[in-house]
């Protein structure tokens, strides 16, 4: 990666590295068979969890541990990290092996999410905990302003399962009905079947988990109107 590309990414991250080799390592996937980002990812995961937990603790002094845990899970989950990675166009800067490049690894959600954690680890090693905390909070500013402890933090599948259990009904059944598209741009179709609804509910997403969550969300809405 040339210095112009590094400069453009640093502007997006709003952080300038003293040791740019750390940023390059954070962007290097293990498929390249060189010094890759997995150790930085491990470090960044722990730092992100601490920073968000600390912020929630001070923002919401009346909220119990369970609700804070659910809010933190929402903020640090893979979907959120992938969104942040796409805001920074991280895929354009990733260093990948040929196999990953050919299969669209630069846009694979798990790789994008992992790279954000690795960048957090790299910033910490390049600076200190106060600096990386400020950087994370800049990235998360809107999300922290918008998160509401009174809203459902549990995912739709969990809420649907709890709904069925509270009504003493069998648990939902999820069937993978179809997978279409290229490896880097697949669409999964899930059918959800529950007692109380005659028809199957269809959910779609870029991976099986997302498709199941969409199906669960639609099922909950249907059950509420039955």
Curated annotation (Swiss-Prot):
Enzyme class: hydrolase
Residues annotated as the enzyme's active site: 45, 117
Main location: cytoplasm
Enzyme Commission number(s) from the entry: 3.1.26.3
Keyword terms of this UniProt record: Cytoplasm, Endonuclease, Hydrolase, Magnesium, Metal-binding, mRNA processing, Nuclease, RNA-binding, rRNA processing, rRNA-binding, tRNA processing
Cofactor: Mg(2+)
RNase III domain residues: 6-128
SMART domains in the cross-refs: DSRM (SM00358), RIBOc (SM00535)
CDD domains noted in UniProt: DSRM_RNAse_III_family, RIBOc
GO annotations of cellular component type: cytoplasm
Molecular function GO labels: double-stranded RNA binding; metal ion binding; ribonuclease III activity; rRNA binding
Gene3D superfamilies: 3.30.160.20, Ribonuclease III domain (1.10.1520.10)
GO terms, biological process: mRNA processing; regulation of gene expression; rRNA processing; tRNA processing
Keyword Transport: no
Residues given in the record as Mg(2+) binding sites: 41, 114, 117
Location of the DRBM domain: 155-225
Keyword Transmembrane helix on entry: no
Catalysed reactions, as listed in the record: Endonucleolytic cleavage to 5'-phosphomonoester
Subcellular location: Cytoplasm
Coiled coil: none
Entry-linked PROSITE patterns: DS_RBD, RNASE_3_1, RNASE_3_2
Subunit structure: Homodimer.
Family: Belongs to the ribonuclease III family.
PANTHER family: RIBONUCLEASE 3 (PTHR11207:SF0), RIBONUCLEASE III (PTHR11207)
Main function: Digests double-stranded RNA. Involved in the processing of primary rRNA transcript to yield the immediate precursors to the large and small rRNAs (23S and 16S). Processes some mRNAs, and tRNAs when they are encoded in the rRNA operon. Processes pre-crRNA and tracrRNA of type II CRISPR loci if present in the organism.
The name this protein goes by in its record: Ribonuclease 3
Species of provenance: Hamiltonella defensa subsp. Acyrthosiphon pisum (strain 5AT)
